[in-house]
Amino acid sequence: MAEAGQRLVLAFDFGTRRIGVAVGNEMLGSATALAPLPARDGIPDWQQIAALLEEWQPDLLVVGLPLNMDGTESDMSRRARKFGNRLHGRFGKPVEVFDERGSTRAAKRIARDAGHRGNYRDDGVDGIAAQLILESFFADDTFLQRMP
């Protein structure tokens, strides 16, 4: 595993139809959106995730946690936690969950500014949301305090 501060990190924006993915390096604090992964009722193609992990060899996985605006858990946040637990169980990688409130709204704004026509059902913003989650994770002071 890479030293703290130099790790490669993959982030996931959990969804029932698509799972956004982004990759980033904590030293740079920046992230890049990757192609989203299809899901069926929140169940991903685990072979695609295995291939992604094989390709990128991340040191850490981050799963966005879609809390309600008042900070309470939602059905989706419970499902996202379960997804994170399964990632850890299947692949043995450390997993952090991170508050993603507002990431989808911000991703839609970024997409609109770039010319997106607003059909998010067919042309989602999942990768952008995962990128924003990861960049926010890198910028979070509490994350820096938790680094080994």
Curated annotation (Swiss-Prot):
SMART domains the UniProt entry points to: YqgFc
Protein name (database record): Putative pre-16S rRNA nuclease
UniProt cross-references to CDD domains, sorted A to Z: YqgF
Family: Belongs to the YqgF nuclease family.
Keywords per UniProt: Cytoplasm, Hydrolase, Nuclease, Ribosome biogenesis
GO cellular component: cytosol
One GO BP annotation of this record: rRNA 5'-end processing
Family matches, as Gene3D superfamilies: YqgF/RNase H-like domain
The protein's enzyme class: hydrolase
InterPro entries: RNaseH-like_sf, YqgF, YqgF/RNaseH-like_dom, YqgF/RNaseH-like_dom_sf
Compartment list: Cytoplasm
MF GO annotations: nuclease activity
A Pfam family per the record: RuvX
UniProt EC number: 3.1.-.-
Function: Could be a nuclease involved in processing of the 5'-end of pre-16S rRNA.
